[in-house]
A protein has these predicted regions:
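Carbohydrate-binding/catalytic loop surfaces
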Residues: 323-334, 380-402, 458-477, 523-535, ...
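Acidic/histidine-rich catalytic neighborhood
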Residues: 442-492
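Acidic/polar, glycine-enriched structural segments that form the non-catalytic walls/loops
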Residues: 29-58, 63, 67-335, 353-358, ...
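Carbohydrate-binding surface patches
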Residues: 151-160, 665-692
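Catalytic cores of secreted or luminal carbohydrate-active enzymes
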Residues: 103-113, 621-670, 674
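Bacterial N-terminal signal peptides
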Residues: 15-24
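Active-site core of glycosidic bond-cleaving carbohydrate-active enzymes
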Residues: 337-373, 392-397, 404-426, 434, ...
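C-terminal beta-sandwich/jelly-roll accessory domains of carbohydrate-active enzymes
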Residues: 676-761
Length: 761
């Protein structure tokens, strides 16, 4: 009797399970997803418009192509317009590996001297075409400029048309002093005591004219040179075009030949063909993904960050450092690895601009030998590392030794997490096997040299430096990265079927590594070191974000996250812009959309310039870029192998839509939300990875070209047997969804650019 009862119950269970699955089977009629977006018109609402001419770097119009940069503003106190040029390749090559030995170097600017006195002016940055129009009204007439940095060619092109008596305005090249920007700042501030006594100045630039091409050649004491070349052509009586190239060579001294050849090639092609190819690149760039937000200001901000990223880097061009191609006098004329690089690159993954993220991959994967030289000699046989500040070839001062002084050793592992995110959004196992796995392994190896087993049977780290806080044993910053690194190496080895000799070591580390030091207020800085004074970095919270080792999927962790975040933010004295974006993303990680928005609003209220640039003691660009990722974190998350659609939406954000956002596992996701309710979701698998989604749709139906098997999991989570190349369309049962992505109409637009009434600096 008992046996028959068990058989009956088993059959009943199977029947109920099959019934559940059959309810979740798709309708075999494929849906379609469409975009109802007029891209030129939509992007025109995001444009930056200046109602008056800016006079500072923070307010200027900016253009770039991942190598060359241009900023346009009126010179303060002078009667000319300044076109500040930049080239990310231009840096010094001295033997000292610091900001005096290997910094980026300024190039100089063009001064547009009008015939009359400048009365006023306006500017308009056309994001869709990446072009700036400038109108200058003087006592003698009007000068109209159309400027762009060509998307593919290494050319800056400025076309001028004039009215009245301004046709004979003058261009003047003013070469910059080619010494470390930190030297320039200390010199201007009268802080000669902070300048190394043995610092030698580079020679001044020499200007010449060679067959219509003007040249400014800057030789460097340590070798190499920079040439800035320009030539002006005239078309009708009122039209003049300035063609500019900047070329840096090292150790060769052939920059002038390259510079002249680039200018002559561009002039032969002609202005309109050059403009056409430039616009084609940008018009192709933006539609890779789409986001529209219920707040016009934040929508404007988001798209300016996409423009900024594409202006600052390309896959085969410069790594984004602290200022991108818009270098100015700054204390930070290099790449900073203790937070800046990591924050800068996050937004490229979800926005599906992984082609741009390749500049970070190339910087690290192509300089393994240099990463080895950054490590003390005794550990170079199996370890890699990077110091706080590097040039674009990853050359830094030597990484410290744990237990000795201020050893900051976790920066390369943190950068490897960025590489891991790029991999997870692409799922290219060749990159994982041949590049990321070996790099991550040797970056984690450096930790392994110093782990010691304590009397408690746990593995402990000697004192290391928690970025910008203090040196402490069992530093949470490093414990988190070590734990994440070992987990990731084991996961990768399993995926790739690699029988690595260190597998048991990594397992042992995970088994015996000491827990994160905590107290009643959450995570500490490290062993016996509480968070005692205000700290702009969230290095001690890395296990929460972006590593998600402590996360809401583990119920006991939620309280730890809330306490740690609250206590960090309770000491506001030193909190700055990226303290806001970090707190926003941590809030999103636990589903608190209202808090996420509140933290983000603090950034907008205090730290942004009129052009979304960011200022601390000098210009830096990473924080606004990280805010784009904070917006992503509200709309879409994919950590832990699960796609979460609209995971942290503020109550006031009733309408949202996005299309083509990319997640870990290489899925493309589109979704629409109206009146606070999700209307539909569309997911396409690019790699065939397991597809698990969480949605607020209570009774979803799943449609596609075949019947998918859907497994229902707790918390409105579903696993879909989606194969590579397949698409699934998800909508509420009983409701008709149109699967059309369209922009949200706004009553305001063009929030950024310098305004006459609401001027911000």
């Amino acid at each position: 009797m008992k046996k028959h009862t068990m058989n009956y119950l088993n059959k009943l269970y199977s029947y109920l399970l099959l019934s559940l699955i059959s309810i979740l089977f798709v309708n075999a009629h494929p849906a379609t997803i469409k975009q109802d977006i007029d891209w030129p018109q939509f992007m025109s609402q995001q444009d930056m418009i200046w109602e008056k001419l800016p006079e500072y770097w923070y307010d200027s119009a900016f253009l770039g192509n991942g190598k060359l940069g241009l900023m346009i503003y009126k010179e303060p106190g002078k009667n000319y317009l300044r076109l500040e040029t930049g080239n990310c390749d231009v840096h010094d090559h001295r033997t000292k590996r610091d900001v005096f030995g290997i910094p980026r170097l300024l190039t100089g600017h063009f001064a547009l001297h009008p015939k009359g006195k400048i009365i006023n002016g306006t500017m308009h940055l056309d994001l869709w075409n990446a072009e700036v129009s400038t109108d200058i009204t003087t006592t003698k007439g009007v000068i109209h400029l159309r400027s762009f940095v060509h998307a593919d060619e290494m050319m800056i092109i400025v076309k001028a048309t004039t009215e009245g008596d301004e046709h004979d305005f003058q261009w003047e090249w003013i070469a910059a002093e080619a010494n470390s920007p930190r030297y320039l700042i200390f010199k201007r501030q009268g802080k000669a005591n902070k300048i190394p006594k043995d610092y030698e100045l580079n020679p001044t630039a020499k200007i010449s004219n060679e067959k219509e091409v003007n040249l400014s050649v800057q030789k460097l004491l340590a070798g190499g040179e920079t040439s800035i070349g320009w030539q002006e052509t005239h078309n009708p009586e009122t039209e003049r075009t300035l063609w500019i190239n900047l070329t840096h060579t090292y150790p060769q001294n052939n920059s002038s030949e390259i510079c002249k050849a680039e200018i002559r090639k561009a002039i032969r092609k002609g202005y309109h063909p050059m403009q056409k190819t430039h616009r084609k690149w940008w018009n192709t760039f933006y539609p890779s993904s789409f986001i529209t937000l219920p707040e016009a200001q934040k929508e404007n901000f988001y798209w300016i960050q996409m423009y900024k990223l594409a202006s600052a880097t390309r896959g085969d061009r410069a790594l984004i450092d602290n200022t991108g191609p818009w270098l100015t006098e700054t204390p930070w004329p290099n790449v900073w690895w203790n937070l800046n690089v990591q924050l800068t690159y996050w937004a490229l993954n979800t926005s599906d601009h992984l082609d741009l993220a390749a500049s970070l991959e190339n910087a690290l994967y192509n300089h393994i030998d240099q990463l080895r030289l950054n490590i003390p000699k005794a550990y170079r046989h199996n370890s890699l590392g990077i110091g706080v500040a590097s040039n674009l070839e990853c050359m830094t001062t030597e990484v410290g030794i744990p237990g000795k002084g201020k050893a900051q050793v976790g920066l390369l592992p943190w950068a490897c997490h960025n590489l891991w995110l790029i991999y997870r959004h692409k799922m290219d196992d060749d990159i994982l096997r041949n590049k990321l796995f070996p790099l991550l392994k040797e970056s984690i190896n450096y930790y392994l040299h110093f782990l010691k087993e304590g009397d408690d049977g746990k593995l402990h780290l000697p004192a290391t430096y928690s970025p910008e806080y203090d040196t402490v044993e069992d530093c949470n910053f490093d414990l988190a990265l070590l734990r994440w690194g070992c987990q990731t190496l084991l996961e990768s080895a399993h995926r790739l079927n690699i029988q690595d000799s260190l597998i048991e070591t990594w397992k042992n580390v995970l088994l015996k590594l000491t827990p994160y030091p905590t107290d009643e207020n959450g995570l500490l800085i490290g062993k016996d070191m509480p968070y005692a004074f205000s700290h702009r970095h969230y290095s001690h919270l890395l296990a929460i974000y972006p590593l998600y080792l402590i996360n809401k999927e583990q119920p006991n962790d939620i309280e730890m996250i809330e306490k740690s975040l609250s206590f960090w933010q309770s000491k506001p004295t030193a909190l700055l812009g990226y303290s806001c974006t970090g707190a926003s993303s941590i809030s999103s990680a636990i589903g608190k959309g209202d808090d996420a928005l509140a933290y983000l609003n603090k950034l907008f209220g205090k730290f942004l310039s009129s052009t979304t640039m960011y200022k601390e003691s000098g210009p830096v660009i990473e924080t606004p870029l990280s805010a784009a990722q904070s917006i992503h974190d509200m709309l879409l998350q994919s950590w832990g192998g699960k796609i979460r659609i609209f995971p942290a939406i503020p109550a006031t954000w009733k309408d949202i839509a996005y299309s083509g956002l990319r997640t870990e596992g290489a899925f493309k996701v589109s979704a629409s939300r109206k009146q606070g309710k999700t209307q539909f979701i569309h997911i396409k698998s690019l790699a065939g990875e397991p597809c698990i989604i969480t949605t607020d749709i209570v009774n979803p139906i799943f449609e596609g070209k075949r019947n998918f098997t859907i497994q229902s999991l707790p918390n409105n989570t579903f696993q879909i047997d989606l194969k590579k190349g397949e698409e699934v369309f998800i909508s509420p049962q009983g409701e008709k969804s149109d699967f059309i992505i369209s922009s949200i109409p706004h009553t305001s637009k063009n929030h950024y650019g310098l305004k006459i009434i609401h001027q911000r600096r």
